[in-house]
Regions:
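Non-transmembrane "mature" sequence context
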Residues: 1-103
Length: 103
């Protein structure tokens, strides 16, 4: 179980902003054990963890996740892509960067 309150604190956002980042309706946050919410938060954690391994810094990874547009994906951020269900594509992009591709 991932606590939306604790996770939003780590991300530096209000709990309601977590709804937007996860791509779930804000009312879903009233049921923090919601399968969909938990799945989305797990996807976010996977992507942020992979980015942290690449950068060596969790804060840089969180900043990248929320703010840096990815040219290969129409200049959308990792957060936007994950919210829209494309976590696997972002993870593949990070793997490409690890293998020497340029972002």
């Amino acid at each position: 179980y991932i606590s939306p309150t604790r996770f939003s604190a780590v991300l530096g956002v209000k709990v309601m902003a977590l709804a937007e980042l996860t791509g779930v309706h804000r009312n879903t946050l009233r049921n923090p054990s919601s399968e969909r919410l938990q799945l989305k938060m797990r996807e976010m954690i996977k992507v942020i963890s992979a980015a942290a391994e690449l950068t060596g810094d969790i804060q840089k990874a969180i900043y990248w996740y929320r703010n840096e547009p990815i040219a290969d994906y129409d200049h959308r951020t990792a957060a936007e892509l994950v919210a829209d269900g494309h976590a696997d594509a972002v993870l593949a992009y990070i793997r490409d960067l690890e293998n020497g591709a340029r972002g």
